[in-house]
């Protein structure tokens, strides 16, 4: 009888300990960043302060990077506690070089201070500079990245392989962000597809609006055009399985 009572007490203790582990508060790094950087892979410091989260919350870190050749790189980054999610690490390239490049990284995790990435060196693998011989002298586009409309953007030559001049803006909200980036430049995307029609990046909602001038159809211009993606690949790390499936959308 005594042995059974001891086993019962141990079982209750284990259940209480397990429940406490599931609902305990964790600490997460918290920050919001909107900036334009010359060399984000080498100079951007993503170190953040820590805050205690509510019971059951996860940590997250998300960054969206947009780059135009010959300009700075726009960085929109968020670290915070989030009320729900699954432990997942995701890298997405929405638009590939040459021309405008848009990529994102997002990490959801469930350990204290697990959203502790402090730089972008392993996230932003800068494409090789396009050789002058690969530039098409007949194709030029106004090119800029700015936090406000850039009406006087300089006209720059486009690399072979680009398909149109892009002129638009990316609006992000949620995850502590409420920001707009204005984008102009040559691109390989078709239509209004710098973000490949994706509507969220981590906890942030994305809205893309644009006009564009196709090199094949110069008079084509559309706001919020709907096209199928030309290049989008997702590298997803599901923890703790540590599997790395690669998904490609032709």
UniProtKB/Swiss-Prot annotation:
Residues linked to a lipid group, GPI-anchor amidated glycine type: 224
Name of the protein: Testis-expressed protein 101
Modification comment: N-glycosylated; by high mannose and/or biantennary complex and/or certain types of hybrid oligosaccharides; possesses different oligosaccharides chains according to its subcellular localization in the testis. Sheds from membrane raft by ACE and released from the cell surface of epididymal sperm while it passes through the caput epididymis leading to disappearance of TEX101 on spermatozoa; is essential to produce fertile spermatozoa.
Expression (tissue specificity): Detected in testis.
Record keywords: Cell membrane, Cytoplasmic vesicle, Glycoprotein, GPI-anchor, Lipoprotein, Membrane, Secreted, Signal
Residues of this chain annotated as glycosylated in UniProt: 45, 110, 134, 160
Propeptide segment residues: 225-250
Places the protein is found: Cell membrane; Membrane raft; Cytoplasmic vesicle, Secretory vesicle, Acrosome; Secreted
Stated role: Plays a role in fertilization by controlling binding of sperm to zona pellucida and migration of spermatozoa into the oviduct. May play a role in signal transduction and promote protein tyrosine phosphorylation.
Membrane topology: Lipid-anchor; GPI-anchor
Chain coiled-coil ranges: none
Entry's Gene Ontology cellular component terms: acrosomal membrane; acrosomal vesicle; cell surface; extracellular region; plasma membrane; plasma membrane raft; side of membrane
Subunit details: Interacts with VAMP3. Interacts with LY6K. Interacts with DPEP3; co-localized on the cell surface of spermatocytes, spermatids, and testicular spermatozoa, co-localized only in cytoplasmic droplets of caput and corpus epididymal sperm. Interacts with ADAM5.
BP term (GO), one: flagellated sperm motility
Provenance organism: Rattus norvegicus
Signal peptide: 1-25
């Amino acid at each position: 009888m005594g042995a059974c009572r001891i086993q019962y007490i141990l079982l209750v203790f284990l259940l209480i300990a397990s429940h406490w582990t599931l609902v305990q508060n964790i600490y997460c790094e918290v920050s919001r960043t909107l900036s334009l950087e010359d060399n984000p892979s080498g100079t951007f410091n993503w170190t953040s302060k820590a805050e205690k989260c509510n019971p059951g919350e996860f940590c997250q870190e998300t960054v969206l990077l947009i780059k135009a050749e010959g300009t700075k790189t726009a960085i929109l980054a968020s670290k915070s506690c989030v009320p729900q999610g699954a432990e997942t690490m995701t890298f997405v390239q929405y638009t590939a070089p040459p021309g405008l490049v848009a990529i994102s990284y997002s990490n959801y995790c469930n350990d204290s201070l697990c959203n502790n990435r402090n730089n972008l060196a392993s996230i932003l693998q800068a494409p090789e500079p396009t050789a002058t011989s690969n530039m098409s002298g007949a194709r030029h586009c106004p090119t800029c990245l700015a936090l406000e409309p850039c009406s006087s953007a300089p006209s720059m030559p486009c690399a072979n392989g680009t398909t149109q001049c892009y002129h638009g803006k990316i609006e992000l909200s949620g995850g502590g962000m409420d920001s707009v980036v204005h984008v102009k430049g040559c691109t390989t995307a078709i239509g209004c597809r710098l973000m490949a029609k994706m509507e969220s990046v981590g906890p942030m909602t994305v809205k893309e609006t644009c006009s564009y001038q196709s090199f094949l159809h110069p008079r084509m211009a559309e706001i919020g055009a709907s096209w199928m993606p030309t290049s989008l690949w997702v590298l997803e790390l599901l923890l703790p399985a540590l599997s790395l499936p690669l998904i490609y959308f032709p």
